Amino acid sequence: MTMMDMNFKYCHKIMKKHSKSFSYAFDLLPEDQRKAVWAIYAVCRKIDDSIDVYGDIQFLNQIKEDIQSIEKYPYEHHHFQSDRRIMMALQHVAQHKNIAFQSFYNLIDTVYKDQHFTMFETDAELFGYCYGVAGTVGEVLTPILSDHETHQTYDVARRLGESLQLINILRDVGEDFENERIYFSKQRLKQYEVDIAEVYQNGVNNHYIDLWEYYAAIAEKDFRDVMDQIKVFSIEAQPIIELAARIYIEILDEVRQASYTLHERVFVYKRKKAKLFHEINSKYHRI
């Protein structure tokens, strides 16, 4: 195993640890594509964790500077400051793919702002946040998952990322509240007459369910729109993207089956993932 292979393996371990659903799906890509996904996921994970886990603004700055070095001089040797193995893997990808570096910087800017979290006044602010933390990831992955990047391809990948982030929010309402964060907008909380603290203490009520389902309907519509346009991605990537998205959309039904609880984090069981795999495999005849 070469040093570069070890770098990619390290990135893969990060992906498997933090997103079993993504790993389950994207590990089915051809080797070069899946390695690129591992590297990009690992970079995005480190960006997210720099503040949330490590509380280290200097580390986030180092990540940004390392990415800028790769963008400016992709073929030169660099003394990376943040995580050398991840950055070497990213540099290798950048030498072969047209990376949307600005999307990395948009993600970093969102993480900077997230240090001083305040509740969103409107849904527009919430959806802007979903773009910043996840739509950006869709954009960065676009050259890996498509043969020819077009405006439509970037748009579909962006919308998929935003939809998955909204599903994350719907899954983690209780956990986020425990961390003093409420991502639903004040506008919508007022409209549906919901107080998250009251729901957390006293249990789910119809007002909360209606609010939750309002946002779930948005995520489900975006999912359907992405599936309708899935052919913008490469033939190899289409079944993989559909599998990842189908696994994620199942989270919403798991929350429903758990009675919308704020005190338990739901997940999609391996048996369900395997069933989805076989359904999509039959559809495409090729995974």
From Swiss-Prot:
Pfam families: SQS_PSY (PF00494). Its cofactor is Mg(2+). Signal peptide: none annotated. Its EC number is 2.5.1.96. One of its GO terms (biological process) is carotenoid biosynthetic process. Keywords: Carotenoid biosynthesis, Magnesium, Metal-binding, Transferase, Virulence. Pathway: Carotenoid biosynthesis; staphyloxanthin biosynthesis; staphyloxanthin from farnesyl diphosphate: step 1/5. PROSITE patterns: SQUALEN_PHYTOEN_SYN_1. (2E,6E)-farnesyl diphosphate 1 binds at H18, S19, K20, S21, Y41, R45, R171, Y248. Gene3D superfamilies: Farnesyl Diphosphate Synthase. Belongs to the phytoene/squalene synthase family. CrtM subfamily. It comes from Staphylococcus aureus (strain bovine RF122 / ET3-1). It is an enzyme of class 2 (transferase). It catalyses: 2 (2E,6E)-farnesyl diphosphate = 15-cis-4,4'-diapophytoene + 2 diphosphate. Mg(2+) 1 binds at D48, D52. InterPro entries: Isoprenoid_synthase_dom_sf, Squ/phyt_synthse, Squalene/phytoene_synthase_CS, Trans_IPPS_bact-type, Trans_IPPS_HH. This is 4,4'-diapophytoene synthase. The keyword Metal-binding applies. Mg(2+) 2 binds at N168, D172.
